[in-house]
Amino acid sequence: MKFLYLHGLGQKPDSWDRVIKETKVSDSSVCLSLAEMLEDKAATYGELYAAFSGECDKEHDEIVLCGLSLGAVLALNYAIDHPDKIKALVLIAAQYKMPKKLLKFQNMLFRFMPNATFKQFGFKKADVISLCGTMAELDFRDSLCKVSCPVLIVCGEKDNANKKASKELAGYLSDSHFYELLKAGHEANIESPEELATVLQEFYNSVE
């Protein structure tokens, strides 16, 4: 099995380093870069998803996808489109229907932030605003029934923006389990890497 990790917007691939180090599958783990996948492409969700799909399609082994925030959206999307390729799915701080008001507010904040903030994560400010704008219409509700693999849904106790949706998602997916990380916020992979790694490894053990 190959374990593919997807970070969130505002993170880099190394956001997963401490988590992966604590698991027993580090040798089979790869952290993908959202910025690299969008390099020389239009900054849209469609382009990002196409590039991510291409990375997954290269794998000949069964895949376990683990994504946080935007990474979770991409992972869920791929599991819907390619259920035969996915052995298991981990969705952290996930949304299955994009919260338009939240995205709009987020984009408004982005406009006031300096370019340097985005550059440290490999993005241009305009590209982040464009990318988030193209996600507003995403809605997977009618397609969730296509997900056939075991799913672990994780959300930080303090991640109020995503907890409700994460719990709802666990209810919609037939073979899923919800886990709340105590004292953690949105960036669970950075805030609670050891606890998250323990939860992930228990899940991985159950699907191997």
Spans of features found by a protein language model:
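Short beta-strand/loop motif that positions the catalytic acidic residue
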Residues: 146-147, 153-155
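Flexible "cap/lid" loop of the alpha/beta hydrolase fold
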Residues: 45, 76, 80-81, 86-115, ...
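Active-site loop/oxyanion-hole signature of alpha/beta-hydrolase fold enzymes
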Residues: 17-21, 30-64, 198
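Hydrophobic, aromatic-rich cap/lid helix
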Residues: 116-140, 158
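Gly/Ala-rich beta-loop-alpha elbow adjacent to hydrolase catalytic centers
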Residues: 67-75
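Active-site glycine-rich loops that stabilize anionic/oxyanionic intermediates
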Residues: 8-11, 69
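Catalytic histidine-centered segment of alpha/beta-hydrolase-like enzymes
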Residues: 184-193
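Serine-hydrolase catalytic-loop signature spanning alpha/beta hydrolases and amidase-signature enzymes
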Residues: 10-18
